[in-house]
């Protein structure tokens, strides 16, 4: 994804109440931030944020956290959130490798991983967001019976992820190898997803649950 550089993006972000500049201050306290006890779902690598904004509007009784390491993408999304007046979402400019610095054990009910970088070279497998190193972190952060929802256009990443989930004793609740070819029940789609659908590319999806 090509992103136009905005030199003062970090300063501009601070103007928006939906942006959390110091998320580590809310570790184990996110219900205090949202001022309610609603479930918390997080999307890791939200890109421009279309997917998580759609979910937030559809599910006002769920709190959403959008995490993205590229400042310019966070800025684009937070502007849309303000324009659409969405109240149950916060955005973080953060790297997934530091998740445990901002989230407490059992604080999250669902994690979304949408079209994450597949890191195709074998020597980079530890960077994949479904590598067992990341799964160890997710298992700490998720509540009992918490879920990971994965969507990808990469068959290799999908197969790798299924293997990793199985090795870490997740239950595979749903495994679909052509999501939009079999059914188009997915209401919330990412920008990438819409592009791939238009090109006729299959989308792979799975839901993995902690039992």
UniProtKB/Swiss-Prot annotation:
Superkingdom of the organism of origin: Bacteria
EC number(s) per entry: 2.1.1.33
Residues at the active site: 117
One Pfam family named in its UniProt record: Methyltransf_4
InterPro entries linked: SAM-dependent_MTases_sf, tRNA_(Gua-N-7)_MeTrfase_Trmb, tRNA_methyltr_TrmB_bact
Sequence similarity: Belongs to the class I-like SAM-binding methyltransferase superfamily. TrmB family.
Name of the protein described by the UniProt record: tRNA (guanine-N(7)-)-methyltransferase
Organism per entry: Alkaliphilus oremlandii (strain OhILAs) (Clostridium oremlandii (strain OhILAs))
């Amino acid at each position: 994804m090509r992103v136009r550089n905005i030199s003062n993006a970090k300063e501009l972000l601070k103007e928006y109440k939906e942006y959390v500049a110091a998320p580590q201050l809310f570790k184990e306290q996110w219900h205090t931030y949202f001022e309610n006890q609603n479930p918390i779902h997080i999307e890791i690598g939200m890109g421009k944020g279309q997917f998580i904004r759609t979910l937030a509007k559809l599910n006002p009784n769920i709190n959403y956290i959008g995490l993205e390491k590229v400042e310019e993408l966070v800025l684009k999304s937070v502007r849309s959130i303000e324009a659409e007046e969405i109240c149950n979402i916060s955005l973080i400019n953060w790297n997934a490798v530091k998740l445990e610095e901002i989230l407490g054990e059992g604080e999250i009910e669902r994690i979304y991983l949408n079209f994450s970088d597949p890191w195709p070279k074998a020597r980079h497998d530890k960077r994949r967001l479904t590598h067992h190193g990341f799964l160890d972190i997710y298992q700490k952060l998720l509540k009992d019976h918490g879920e990971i929802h994965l969507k990808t256009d990469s068959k290799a990443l999908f197969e790798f992820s299924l293997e990793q989930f199985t090795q870490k004793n997740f239950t595979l609740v749903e495994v679909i190898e052509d999501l939009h070819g079999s059914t188009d029940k997915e209401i919330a789609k990412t920008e990438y997803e819409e592009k791939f659908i238009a090109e006729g590319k299959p989308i792979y999806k799975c839901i993995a649950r902690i039992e």
